[in-house]
């Protein structure tokens, strides 16, 4: 999320995606890609994480939305239905 206690204390991924869509004019899929794969690539960890592929590490959040369009426009609610961390269902 670009969380930085000194300049940006926003911890909501959905809110950051909303800002990307509304103010940076990104497509929703582009905002999600820029929040997952691109950071992994910048950190040189894209071979092991950043996308859902066989053999990669993944922490996955499943949102309870009927369409990708809902993600940036319902940022005030918590749509998280399931959380998978290191292969374990934790929520």
Where in this protein do the model-derived segments appear?
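His/Asp/Glu-enriched, well-ordered alpha-helical/loop segment
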Residues: 1-63
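C-terminal cap of metal-dependent C-N hydrolases
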Residues: 35-37, 57-91
